[in-house]
């Protein structure tokens, strides 16, 4: 990897480009005097990055940006935002079985072993003691939209999410059949 380090009496920063878990990743770490550090990751393979960081092995591929604001000096408590594009959720039979009921394309990707594919994903997280609290989690694909909030405990390997799942194709058909709904939602005439 390649790194640049900057230090003065107000700020310390590290910027770098290297491989994290085999994924080319840009990293930026900043620490201002009298404040907690921030960290940014940008990668073309978010699955490999999340695996290397010890978060999950269940994401495959995907461009990903992770912005972290630490909330203590021990780096154990932080909030952040994760944005991802073009990724799959794999090896999660409970989630896959639930989603396959709503989406024919989901069934097709499960049979081929690719998991559930999403075009976009976004999550706001709060992490403390290996417990992730999601106050906003959005996932979307051509056929499926998910909005949720809840908790993920890495030590107990448990997840508790509440939210909604919508078959996007069905919503699109309803909007196209009833133009007034489309105008109401978009404001366009």
Briefly describe each language-model feature range:
Residues 1-120, 124-132, 144-189:
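Membrane-proximal interfacial segments on either side of biological membranes
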